């Protein structure tokens, strides 16, 4: 172990159910702090840089083409996309009719983006599916 940081709590550098981690091209460590409804950002030594609180239970992040993609698990659910500096680019959610296998948009658990920009989201709970979103 080279270094560790954080403890349970609600302040900067404290966490409530860490859910995913990503390191961007500038070596910033981006962490989904799910139960605190935020994304916390640190330098690679663990020094707190900032937090983004305009999220609902962030479950996973993915970085592609200088954009940060986040799948959210809260009551609004959905996907948010920001620039690396934290400017919101897009946000959407989806609600299906609740039929088995259709998903709800609330249970997003994982996210990735392919080379053509299509976004894949895994859903847990009633949906239990993989959803693919493409630009139109």
Language model features with spans:
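Eukaryotic scaffold repeat domains enriched in small/polar residues
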Residues: 1-136
């Amino acid at each position: 172990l080279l270094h560790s940081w954080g403890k349970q709590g609600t302040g900067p550098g404290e966490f409530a159910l860490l859910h995913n981690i990503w390191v961007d091209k500038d070596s910033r460590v981006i962490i989904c702090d799910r139960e605190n409804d935020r994304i916390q950002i640190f330098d690679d030594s663990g020094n707190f840089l900032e937090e983004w609180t305009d999220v609902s239970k962030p479950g996973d992040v993915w970085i592609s083409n200088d954009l940060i993609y986040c799948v959210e698990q809260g009551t609004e659910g959905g996907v948010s996309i920001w620039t690396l500096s934290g400017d919101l680019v897009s946000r959407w959610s989806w609600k299906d009719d609740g039929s088995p296998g259709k998903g709800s948009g609330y249970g997003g658990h994982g996210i990735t983006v392919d080379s053509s920009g299509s976004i894949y989201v895994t859903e847990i709970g009633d949906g239990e599916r993989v959803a693919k979103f493409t630009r139109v």
